[in-house]
Amino acid sequence: MAPIGEKKRFELEKSIEPIYTGGPVAFDSNEKILVTALTDRIIGTRSETGERLFSIKKDEDDYVTALAITSDSKKLIAAFRSRLLTIYEIPSGRRIKSMKAHETPVITMTIDPTNTLLATGGAEGLVKVWDIAGAYVTHSFRGHGGVISALCFGKHQNTWVLASGADDSRVRLWDLNSSRSMAVFEGHSSVIRGLTFEPTGSFLLSGSRDKTVQVWNIKKRSAVRTIPVFHSVEAIGWVNGQPEEKILYTAGEGNLILAWDWKSGSRLDPGVDTTHSETNAIIQVVPFSENTLLSVHSDLSLLLRKRVPGEGFITIKKLNGSFDEVIDCAWIGDDHLAVCSNTEFIDVISTDGTQVFGVLEGHTDIVLTLDSSEDGVWLATGAKDNTVRLWNLNIEDNVYKCIHVFTGHTASVTAVALGPLDVNGYPTFLASSSQDRTLKRFNLGSQLNKSDFSNRAVWTIKAHDRDVNAIQVSKDGRIIASASQDKTIKLWDSSTGEVVGVLRGHRRGVWACSFNPFSRQLASGSGDRTIRIWNVDTQQCVQTLEGHTGAILKLIYISQGTQVVSAAADGLVKVWSLSSGECVATLDNHEDRVWALASRFDGSLLVSGGADAVVSVWKDVTEEYIAKQAEELERRVEAEQLLSNFEQTEDWQQAIALALSLDRPHGLLRLFERVMTAPHQPNSITGNKDVDNVLVQLPDHQLIILFQRIRDWNTNSKTSMVAQRLLRLLLHSYSPEHLLKLSGIKDILDSMIPYTDRHLARVNDLIEDSYIVDYVI
């Protein structure tokens, strides 16, 4: 029996999965539905809650080139590289119509304000207008000499018009009433990436990668103003769509969104934009709400940017798009996680996956390791840039600050570990290891806030002969453990850096180690697929846990040190009881190796992250499970007693129904044997007419259960007579049409035929042998 307090059951509370892996994005501002493309599907997500509304399967090799959603939230239109244009019903995801759109892939498309027309632009330079309801072409416009890159519906002098831009640097205006070209605007020197009509319909604005916005007078067919925006433009539009505001935004290169007075050409928010990035660019912008835009970035991030007059567009929220490969995670606070995922940034996210609270920027290469303090205030990070950073986290105010940068390693930092907190709440020291095979200690404490703080290592030692994969600090801070590819775990005096023990026994490299916070034990996990529990004092292995089919990559203790949780390359997370040495729970929600594992400080939640870009949040439901088990046991005891009472009173109808619902094959067999050995009633197959009447009126779900029991009993000669009599009754009482509707009935009957033939042959042999008795007599 497991000790009191052990956790035996976990349920998946939240699976934070990628919603975006690149390509176009569509957004319905009315219902707040975000439509994005994944590798093998198109999904719709409620942007405010993260709830997945629909998922549309597509060919993995067929890339989505354009998306559009009607403003009434009823239809989604997707264009594919295969040149198909498909209309879907949402939220059901049902395909309404598919048709071949262009001779080349559709690059851009837009829907008119009435949800009647769809405009598509192809790579061949052709523009088509479609009737959405009828799914047929109403207009086809030729004239551009390159790929269509921007489209926009508008109204000019009560006439519906369509503007198109292409990589021939020209803007064309088409009259939808006459199906003719109204104007050709020339003035840009690069591809057109954004088009929008001034709210009165008198002017058309175009943005280009030539870093300018042109304002065109439609009536005069000429440019009235050129606005130099000083960045390559990928999108333009109106900040909130209100005509009286007339605030133009431009977005694109450098991660910038800027606000402009389109009449004067002056920038409205001259303050420094802190979101500027040389390597990250905005590839698409869609209106989200009043003064707020959703920007899609080349690094696959999705940001909500709100305009604050005088300050510019500030990031108010980051939506979880894709983590890429999750390498490590750490719990900070009650419902926040720090996650590193194959980038130089660390995301601070909510455990429900709805948003990213902050992004820790500072490392210049991929972050490989994290460790947080027990109070969630301090976070240590190590990266491929050979540096270690210490962060102070103010979760309540959502302020995250890098306090110090520690250097000295000559290769990627593979592991970091914080020492225990001092009386003032500061971590006493920080340990780090690297692919340079060294181990370093940096003193912290209250000196962190002093101007003369030294970020130099107190000591540096060559720890192992091969890469160091993991390090851990004991609860009291006296010992540092290091695990290496050289198959050993070494114990170090944290004050002096002297080795105090070497643990040998693993047959392959050791990937993980963890100190038991409540005893002098250490757990280690290796590429040999085993977990070893070591006595720190004697340095002997006291227990070996086996069950994974891949390398053990991460270990943590829970339940006051009575259990170990392991994450492995087989994609599984296992919970082990140290008292029995057995796995008490296996958590399966990953399709690739699980690198990251963390536990909330009260042990009520586990988090795992894997190479499949999925973060899984597991909730401890042991108490509910035990209570449910006790309730189920009580219910079964009562039902067993009730079944016994029914048998005693020969209430066969109630007895059979109860035995079937309890799924007790032995009890049901005993009941039928008793009926068939009792005095036989005439004209009854089972021997009792009441039983016959019950069996010929069974509901389908109980009927299929009975067929399954008959199949099992038919395999044994001792119980085959009961099975054959019941089978005869059922085949005579139910029509073939009725029986064929039962799920799996064909396989059940097919499996009974060989045994039935064998029983028939055995009975025939007995009959033949009985004639010998007649002959002798």
From Swiss-Prot:
Primary location group: nucleus
InterPro entries: G-protein_beta_WD-40_rep, Utp13_C, WD40/YVTN_repeat-like_dom_sf, WD40_repeat_CS, WD40_repeat_dom_sf, WD40_rpt
MF (Gene Ontology): U3 snoRNA binding
Record field: transmembrane: none
Highest taxon, organism lineage: Eukaryota
PROSITE patterns for the chain: WD_REPEATS_1, WD_REPEATS_2, WD_REPEATS_REGION
Cystine crosslinks: none
Keywords linked to the UniProt accession: Nucleus, Repeat, rRNA processing, WD repeat
Pfam families assigned: Utp13 (PF08625), WD40 (PF00400)
Record's GO cellular component terms: 90S preribosome; nucleolus; small-subunit processome
Assembly, per entry: Component of the ribosomal small subunit (SSU) processome.
Protein name: Probable U3 small nucleolar RNA-associated protein 13
Name of the gene: utp13
